[in-house]
Amino acid sequence: MTTEKSLVTEAENSQHQQKEEGEEAINSGQQEPQQEESCQTAAEGDNWCEQKLKASNGDTPTHEDLTKNKERTSESRGLSRLFSSFLKRPKSQVSEEEGKEVESDKEKGEGGQKEIEFGTSLDEEIILKAPIAAPEPELKTDPSLDLHSLSSAETQPAQEELREDPDFEIKEGEGLEECSKIEVKEESPQSKAETELKASQKPIRKHRNMHCKVSLLDDTVYECVVEKHAKGQDLLKRVCEHLNLLEEDYFGLAIWDNATSKTWLDSAKEIKKQVRGVPWNFTFNVKFYPPDPAQLTEDITRYYLCLQLRQDIVAGRLPCSFATLALLGSYTIQSELGDYDPELHGVDYVSDFKLAPNQTKELEEKVMELHKSYRSMTPAQADLEFLENAKKLSMYGVDLHKAKDLEGVDIILGVCSSGLLVYKDKLRINRFPWPKVLKISYKRSSFFIKIRPGEQEQYESTIGFKLPSYRAAKKLWKVCVEHHTFFRLTSTDTIPKSKFLALGSKFRYSGRTQAQTRQASALIDRPAPHFERTASKRASRSLDGAAAVDSADRSPRPTSAPAITQGQVAEGGVLDASAKKTVVPKAQKETVKAEVKKEDEPPEQAEPEPTEAWKVEKTHIEVTVPTSNGDQTQKLAEKTEDLIRMRKKKRERLDGENIYIRHSNLMLEDLDKSQEEIKKHHASISELKKNFMESVPEPRPSEWDKRLSTHSPFRTLNINGQIPTGEGPPLVKTQTVTISDNANAVKSEIPTKDVPIVHTETKTITYEAAQTDDNSGDLDPGVLLTAQTITSETPSSTTTTQITKTVKGGISETRIEKRIVITGDADIDHDQVLVQAIKEAKEQHPDMSVTKVVVHQETEIADE
């Protein structure tokens, strides 16, 4: 179609158009409902209307009419191709075009001869004139117009009937769909070129890709490109695939606001909505610290958990004592370098590793000494030993947030797997376990905890804290929601449907819970992945995915290890001060203290060196049982004497039979030390006392302590604190720490007849196994109901049993303390005595739990 052809058509039809303009003006009002029809059905509708009109007048369509219909159908197909482009124009322009097309269709319906003569030219004229606004036509009266308007009016009820007939509408629609499909197939090359041209003119939206940098736990950087609208889980999945990690639910991506504050990337939201600024830099960290790392399926997961804990120790987020640092550092060296080889390892090979925030030469020497004693320990075993000791630390897996209490005092709120912790001056002052928390919420910059009422309380109590900002309060609330859901629930909650003007946050943890993660990990069926260690690039020697180390069967350190003392810190429940040694002239004593807590994992036991003369061994077993009713107590006083007599008749095997402390956890020390080193150990004892005094409140001395001080050759300081548990019903555990100071011991006070005293040497070794997060200091000692002391003696031993009953917070607690003093001139198997005492205590009181075992050994050696 060209412009010249359209000009010729206008000249031929100028007179005919003037006649028809009046008709168009009159019929425009009646044809408004028809203008809503699509352009493709316009010509076919007119053909149907003409046939309907002739049928109503008694006429039948002739052969000429049928040929006209065919021509109109082909013309309408050509029109529909071109009208499709006009549909994309602005609305005002399209409305004008539709009006013109409807008017031209009416002209076709008025006279068949005019359409035959000017069929093609009229179509072209309509197409070219559609965008041009026509002048206002003059109204003319003509009988033919009335006829036409009447006929058009008659067609309107027919259209209404069609609308009421659904079957017809469906058939008509099907016919239109078929017609449109055919038209698409018959599309001309010219129309294809036009559509391609218009498509090329449209701006093509390309999704912008973002460059991400993720700092991994082995101090490497993983770079990748993600789509701009990618979610957090997409990036986390790519990082875990890069690291070959399948147990990815324990990990997360963090955005660090500063050196101490981080925000976890929400895996369910788009990354661009959580990141401020263009550089997308993240760190890959452990988000949920497993309470029992031994339950992890794969060694590679435990290895990355070890890397995270090493970072926490170096950064100061996981405080440790000197002995703990030395032990954990030795396992780190064993994991990275393997067994000690004098030819491969130099003198200062430990200095290449960063093991502590303030790493000293003394610490490196202790680490080397321990490392040299390990034999044939695989990297996977070293990692597991590392985790078994690290999980006992009090700050293990605690996410810290700065806050203030209602009085404006600075505190720190910590979130962990067991609940919410409150710290003040680096000491834990309160704890809210998840079972006791009813609701957590925030409002502006305030954070609130609603506590479940106790047995004697009627109403819930709400505790509030003030955080630096609204953003900090919301972040703490989200961390609490995630930890509670992950560790306490079996499945995640579904996000509630959005309501109109719904208040509160819709945030829910969207990942898998710990229970779901363990189920998925149990289905992992692949050989153990081979990976390289960080420092040494050693390949893992593990042959299976879950190489659990049997601590009872394996002793990684030989019995003839060099002597160093090692303790366990009370605040963290792990190995504590390095060597505690006090020497008094002309006398020698050896004191060995072992404190063992009942745990699901097998605890450990000391193996002291054999002594040469008179020995006194005291085993302090404290058994604590909770009762749900305040009035209900355990009637054990009458049975105690009989149980003590029957204890040697029972030899049942216990769950915690492997209570021996492995040599790998022993630090023995040579007896011959210089005066300068002795002063250091005096200072270490003072420091240990200070730590215990800060962590546990000092109560009144018990009756047994008064009696002991009158009969003991040295002064003993007992610090007792009550520690409530967090899981299940409230349970009060008692922690007893005994510190011996023999500086003022006098030779004449030693009650012995057989062996004179020349000198005394005291070595104090403290062991504490697996302190869980369920323990915390409590300032309320409770109300003492009864106290009873029973003493029984044999030729070689004296047993003192003290039974105390207290009530605290509606909970009745019965505590039984047994002191067994064994005297004799011959060597005694201390390990067997300790195991036997624990076994008898558990057999005598199966419904009670052993919370502490303290072994105190004194050795007096006479001059020759």
Curated annotation (Swiss-Prot):
Domain of life per record: Eukaryota
Domain FERM, residue spans: 210-491
PTM entry text: Phosphorylated at multiple sites by different protein kinases and each phosphorylation event selectively modulates the protein's functions.
Keywords carried by this UniProt record: Actin-binding, Calmodulin-binding, Cell cycle, Cell division, Cytoplasm, Cytoskeleton, Elliptocytosis, Glycoprotein, Hereditary hemolytic anemia, Mitosis, Nucleus, Phosphoprotein, Pyropoikilocytosis, Transport
Single annotated GO MF: structural constituent of cytoskeleton
InterPro entries per record: Band_4.1_C, Band_41_domain, EPB4.1_FERM_F1, Ez/rad/moesin-like, FA, FERM/acyl-CoA-bd_prot_sf, FERM_2, FERM_central
Function: Protein 4.1 is a major structural element of the erythrocyte membrane skeleton. It plays a key role in regulating membrane physical properties of mechanical stability and deformability by stabilizing spectrin-actin interaction. Recruits DLG1 to membranes. Required for dynein-dynactin complex and NUMA1 recruitment at the mitotic cell cortex during anaphase.
Protein name, UniProt field: Protein 4.1
Species in which this protein is naturally found: Homo sapiens (Human)
